[in-house]
């Protein structure tokens, strides 16, 4: 018979093991697998069974294909990284934007409910109008100003129809792996330009909270591990800055003398309106025990080649 002390020790060991691994999903289905965020989602769950689908293997805008794939796979979690991210292009192709950013999410939410899976869906800071003077809380009222933003907001609503859904709002994603050939974000382009000695155009009047993709992936794993309550979670690196400040920080980390062309949003013709103040607060994510590092820390880790 085990002693009481040994039994307690074993129980504590088991509890710690469960907290690290047992609460995590065994099978993860990832959509939009050719994108940068999905790349790191697949990596962060490398100790799980991951089924990753690109647009070629699963058209998420086809409800029957979604239902059939989810039923056949029976995942514990669906992580939706598929999205129409061309903000200006959405003004010219609203049907395509809503099909991928909203209706596809409805199909995934319904399929997740049918198999009892948790749905993780990524949204955007663009659901806000940018009129705030301090970082937007997770529960702040949205006010989309473009077709893209509206399609993402409707996608959030559809995602939250699923009984177990985590909607994670990210912003200005960056952190493409070395030799990455896929789509790159604004900060990736800024750093590339600085490295190559090109003149880089940056906004002086847009405030952002950049999101480092490996940190977003780690936060996603954490929320699933602690079985976070369904709802909306802001997932950005701590702090905020103008694109001008971000570019200057990147140049300092790179050790280069930057050639920067400063502009305001009013000076650049854009088809879709952008919110000027996009800082997000991570109150709910922090309350689960996960503290996002500062954007400066994340930028430094990325530029110096540190990632997952």
Report each predicted region and the residues it spans.
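C-terminal amphipathic/interface module of NAD(P)-dependent oxidoreductases
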Residues: 15-17, 273-308
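NAD(P)H-binding glycine-rich loop region in Rossmannoid oxidoreductase-like domains
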Residues: 60-100
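NAD(P)-cofactor binding segment of oxidoreductase domains
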Residues: 92-120
């Amino acid at each position: 018979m085990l002693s009481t002390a040994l039994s307690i020790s074993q129980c504590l060991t088991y509890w710690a093991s469960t907290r690290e691994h047992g609460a995590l999903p065994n099978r993860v289905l990832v959509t939009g697998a050719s994108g940068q965020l999905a790349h790191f989602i697949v990596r962060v769950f490398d100790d799980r069974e991951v089924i990753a689908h690109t647009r070629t293997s699963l058209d998420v805008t086809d409800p029957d294909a979604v239902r059939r794939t989810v039923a056949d796979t029976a995942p514990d979690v669906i992580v939706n990284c598929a999205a129409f991210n061309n903000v200006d292009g959405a003004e010219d192709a609203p049907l395509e934007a809503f099909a991928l950013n909203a209706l596809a999410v409805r199909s995934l939410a319904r399929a997740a409910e049918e198999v009892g899976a948790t749905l993780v869906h990524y949204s955007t800071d663009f659901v806000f109008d940018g009129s705030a003077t301090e970082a937007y809380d997770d529960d702040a009222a949205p006010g989309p100003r473009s077709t893209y933003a509206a399609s993402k907001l409707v996608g959030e609503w559809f995602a939250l129809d699923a009984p177990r859904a985590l909607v994670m709002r990210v912003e200005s994603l960056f952190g493409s792996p070395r030799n990455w050939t896929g789509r790159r974000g604004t900060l990736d382009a800024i750093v590339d330009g600085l490295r190559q000695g090109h003149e880089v155009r940056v906004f002086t009047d847009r405030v952002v909270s950049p999101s480092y993709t490996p940190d977003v992936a780690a936060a996603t794993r954490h929320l699933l591990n602690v079985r976070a309550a369904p709802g909306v979670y802001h997932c950005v690196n701590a702090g905020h800055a103008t694109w001008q400040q971000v570019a200057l920080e990147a140049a300092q980390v790179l050790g280069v003398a930057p050639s920067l062309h400063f502009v305001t949003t009013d000076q650049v013709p854009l088809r879709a309106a952008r919110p000027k103040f996009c800082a997000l607060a991570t109150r709910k994510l922090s309350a689960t025990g996960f503290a996002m590092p500062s954007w400066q820390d994340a930028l430094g880790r990325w530029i110096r080649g540190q990632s997952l």
